[in-house]
Amino acid sequence: MDQINHTNVKEFFFLELTRSRELEFFLFVVFFAVYVATVLGNALIVVTITCESRLHTPMYFLLRNKSVLDIVFSSITVPKFLVDLLSDRKTISYNDCMAQIFFFHFAGGADIFFLSVMAYDRYLAIAKPLHYVTMMRKEVWVALVVASWVSGGLHSIIQVILMLPFPFCGPNTLDAFYCYVLQVVKLACTDTFALELFMISNNGLVTLLWFLLLLGSYTVILVMLRSHSGEGRNKALSTCTSHMLVVTLHFVPCVYIYCRPFMTLPMDTTISINNTVITPMLNPIIYSLRNQEMKSAMQRLQRRLGPSESRKWG
């Protein structure tokens, strides 16, 4: 029998989204515009919350960190994707692929914990308004933010440690535009059933249960709001529905990707583009357009910067 060559694969190839160069260029223009909008929109939220003292509260501190995370999450895959759209040879080295998997799961895992902390913050604000200031004092929400980043790091370390021992010695083509961990695992030239089962239980079931838990938490909050009245109720209702929409946009693709056997389906690329390219752009739109405080703060910031710009050019 011929001996199997266990030499590690040096690089992976990405399949083309389309064979038309004109369509690839069109997609480049569209996704480049989306990426710029993502960075600028989330950066605007970060600057507004930082410069506007009225927004120096736990909820907006968490939102600012969420915006930073959205920029990071999008930047892990989209710039490489844009370069590949203009390239004839769409490849990524083995080391860069492992790094992309690490940072992708780092940001994705941290995002899940951030959304959970934001739900906890809204629960305390509505269920325990008299104790909210003491229960969500600065030391507490800073610790929660740090814990979210650390948890994301631990999650990504586990993903990469599990994959590193597997040899890649043959097929090296991914039907994706980034190192999609489920497809990378399938390319290993050894039995990956145990790893696939662990990832489905670790990523899939945990993500599904977490999603249902967050939806349940916001449902409880919305029920509590029925006993409130006036402007405060409308403000809290708008905030919670925005959070629920963002949670849904984040978790539904994750549930689709991880709560099933490792196989390639026709919708995978569309779901991945929605998750990595579109959703990070939608988050600042959802949070700003549905939040009157945020819109007012942006207007005040614009007026504050306006006169200085006029003097600069006058």
UniProtKB/Swiss-Prot annotation:
The Gene Ontology CC terms held by the record are: plasma membrane
Record topology, Cytoplasmic segments:
50-57, 121-139, 220-235, 290-314
Q: Which residues are on the Extracellular side of the membrane? A: 1-25, 80-100, 159-195, 259-269
The record's GO molecular-function terms, alphabetically, read: G protein-coupled receptor activity; olfactory receptor activity
Q: CDD domains given for it?
A: 7tmA_OR4D-like (cd15936)
Q: Which family does it belong to?
A: Belongs to the G-protein coupled receptor 1 family.
Instruction: Give the protein's recorded name.
Output: Olfactory receptor 4D6
Q: Organism, per UniProt? A: Homo sapiens
Encoding gene, per UniProt annotation: OR4D6
